[in-house]
Structure formats: structure tokens, C-alpha cells
Swiss-Prot record:
Full protein name: Large ribosomal subunit protein uL4
Function: One of the primary rRNA binding proteins, this protein initially binds near the 5'-end of the 23S rRNA. It is important during the early stages of 50S assembly. It makes multiple contacts with different domains of the 23S rRNA in the assembled 50S subunit and ribosome. Forms part of the polypeptide exit tunnel.
Annotated source species: Parabacteroides distasonis (strain ATCC 8503 / DSM 20701 / CIP 104284 / JCM 5825 / NCTC 11152)
Residue ranges, annotated region (Disordered): 44-77
Family from the record: Belongs to the universal ribosomal protein uL4 family.
Gene (name only): rplD
Length: 209
């Protein structure tokens, strides 16, 4: 698949980039995508949730009413889960949500996500650029020139560039990552994928198998 390379003014440079069909042109595997996104989101969880159970609630252990003869239901102490202020039954406890996923499944998922973008003509290639200073206004202008400003976009750089990153950080609909940070969730969470000319080669090198 060949794509035209644009400059930051949105003009066609006349150069072409050929995307590797083994990465951008495979038959997408939805189940692999599901597993990779599930793992990514699970790994983001802190898992620090905690609620007190019956034995942890502060309160008297005195039996509220006698066992028999009162005419009502049996009742223990004030920490009972059926009473307001009592402990919670089977409440959440701190835990680690991370789980293992095979490298081949991850690779297949990311190739599938990239293939979906290529299939939907949602990939734009821009020549390598940098900025003199972090300017959000300039980043918006570049996005408008490339006709990707209206919807969520993900820009992939070959390596870290703080000037570009800081320029986009304050934008709700824009994200900037490096090619080595590329993941299935980030690709699918964006409507348009903007690759710099050099990042295409880095992405293909990372997924070469």
C-alpha cells in the first residue's frame, strides 16, 4: 500500500511511502485485539480498592438482642452487614489485575489495529518535523492542514520530541507517542493515525517477525 507524504502545510511533497502489507495489510484478528486491549486496561488499574468487612468495622461485639424469645429475627452485634454502618460482605480487596499475554498475540493485535486504520484510509504520513517552541496553536494549525483536526488523532514520532509532545498535551483530541510506545488501545482509540516519515520505518522494524 502506497501513501503520499505531506508536509506540515498539508501540501503533497510528491514522495510516496510503501506500507508493509505484513503489518498494515493483514486480515484483522478481533479476538487478539480484544485480549490486548483488555490487558492494557487491566494493567492501568491501581487495584487499591478496599472496603471494611465485618471483622474490620469499629463497633461493639455485644449481641443486640437475645437469641430466642424476642419474636424477631436472630441478630448478632452492631457490625452485622445487614445493619447500617456494618461491614460489607465480600467487599473489594487490594489486588493486582495484570495478566500475561503472549508476545505473538500482542504483535498480531497491533498489526490488526494498524490494518484496520489502513483499510479505513485513516493513516496520514507527514514528513519529519520539529517545533521551535511548544506551541499548541501551531500544532492545531498542522492538524488542520493535514485535515485531521476535527476528530481524535494519534501522532507517532520516531523518537521522543518534547516540543511536539508539549504542544499537543493540552488538546483533548490529540495524543503524541513514539513508535516504540505504539499499542493497540492507542491506535483504536484515535480516529486518525498520523505517522511521520521516519516513524513508519521504526514501526515496521519493531513489528518485523
Amino acid at each position: 500500500m502506497e501513501l503520499s507524504v505531506f508536509n506540515i502545510k498539508g501540501e503533497d511533497t510528491g514522495r510516496k511511502v510503501t506500507l508493509n502489507d505484513a503489518i498494515f495489510g493483514i486480515e484483522p484478528n478481533d479476538h487478539a485485539i480484544y485480549l490486548d486491549v483488555k490487558q492494557y486496561l487491566a494493567n492501568q488499574r491501581q487495584g487499591t480498592h478496599k472496603s471494611k468487612e465485618r471483622s474490620e468495622v469499629s463497633g461493639s461485639t455485644r449481641k443486640l438482642i437475645r437469641q430466642k424469645g424476642g419474636g424477631g429475627a436472630r441478630r448478632g452485634d452492631i457490625n452485622s452487614p445487614v445493619l447500617v454502618g456494618g461491614g460489607r460482605v465480600f467487599g473489594p480487596k487490594p489486588r493486582d489485575y495484570e495478566f500475561k499475554l503472549n508476545k505473538k498475540v500482542k504483535s498480531l493485535a497491533r498489526k490488526s489495529a494498524l490494518s484496520y486504520k489502513a483499510k479505513n484510509n485513516a493513516i496520514v504520513v507527514v514528513e519529519d518535523f520539529t517545533m521551535e517552541a511548544p506551541k499548541t496553536k501551531e500544532f492545531i494549525t498542522i492538524a488542520k492542514n493535514l485535515k485531521v483536526a476535527d476528530k481524535k488523532l494519534l501522532m507517532v514520532l520516531p523518537e521522543k520530541n518534547n516540543l511536539v509532545y508539549l504542544s499537543a498535551r493540552n488538546l483533548e483530541k490529540a495524543s503524541v507517542i513514539t513508535a516504540s510506545e505504539l499499542n493497540t488501545y492507542a491506535v483504536l482509540n484515535a480516529v486518525n493515525l498520523v505517522l511521520t516519515e521516519s516513524s513508519v520505518a521504526v514501526v515496521e522494524q519493531n513489528f518485523k517477525a
